Amino acid sequence: MKWSEISIHTTEEAVEAVSHILHEAGASGVAIEDPAELTKEREQQYGEIYALNPDEYPAEGVLIKAYFPQTDSLHETIAGVKSSIDVLPSYDIEIGTGNITVNEVNEEDWATAWKKYYHPVQISDTFTIVPTWEEYTPSSPEEKIIELDPGMAFGTGTHPTTTMCIRALEKTVQPGDTIIDVGTGSGVLSIAAAKLGASSVQAYDLDPVAVESAEMNVRLNKTDDVVSVGQNSLLEGIEGPVDLIVANLLAEIILLFPEDAARVVKSGGLFITSGIIAAKEKVISEALEKAGFTIEEVLRMEDWVAIIARNA
């Protein structure tokens, strides 16, 4: 079978949104070429544990590659992807050039091409993200491994917003905590919470493909006794109280449910949010405070922030 490699040149801010659009369009694999990966802060903090080839990354911006089987409807699929990306600026998401190119690849090439972008990455004092096909031995008994198959995943666990959420969970999760993960994507935050000692994690996503991906990764990490995955829109119809809510979503989406979060999280409980570019920190903080939360800590990495807020 012949496959088409769709390459989109965009910004780091738009990576999650564009990746989601591509998965929604039926992509069978997505690879992200972000030159920031070459100089990640974690390399100074934890030591470089893999080598990347700078020649494979764009000089500026981010290149997202997605793989689609060649069909009679491919042209319409690409047009739909472009239309969806063109709408993102109306949500204050900078898309950069948004240029789209198409190349033909053989099945044997695409099946392994995107895997070269995923390697074991230690993202915190506790966790290392490991692709399922990689051999990796923990460096200490305390190191926790999260295995991910990013073939369908919405994020690989190494984006700054996901990294900060995991570090925030490390700071806050107590044994026996009950947790809700809103917009779970690959399930990585739910898996981390389970491995940190949570007794119950409810993971929700509106996208059925994300739900399938999260379920697979939860089983892969043997955390399905703690984590339940379901399809749901944000916190609609969800009852509390729970000890903690975590949501790694675009700022525009977070603004839709601070009041629901305050309703579901117990008094004194926590709401961890990320997916927030630095320029939108103030508007998110104000919305959380208006809903009754107190900002306890703000984590920063590159141009992104994560907020830890406590309910009244």
Curated annotation (Swiss-Prot):
Its main location: cytoplasm. GO terms for biological process: methylation. GO terms for cellular component: cytoplasm. Keywords: Cytoplasm, Methyltransferase, S-adenosyl-L-methionine, Transferase. It is found in: Cytoplasm. GO terms for molecular function: protein-lysine N-methyltransferase activity. Pfam families: PrmA (PF06325). It catalyses: L-lysyl-[protein] + 3 S-adenosyl-L-methionine = N(6),N(6),N(6)-trimethyl-L-lysyl-[protein] + 3 S-adenosyl-L-homocysteine + 3 H(+). Its EC number is 2.1.1.-. InterPro entries: Ribosomal_L11_MeTrfase_PrmA, Ribosomal_PrmA_MeTrfase, SAM-dependent_MTases_sf. S-adenosyl-L-methionine binds at residues 162, 183, 205, 248. Methylates ribosomal protein L11. HAMAP family: Methyltr_PrmA. Belongs to the methyltransferase superfamily. PrmA family. This is Ribosomal protein L11 methyltransferase. It comes from Bacillus anthracis. The gene is prmA.
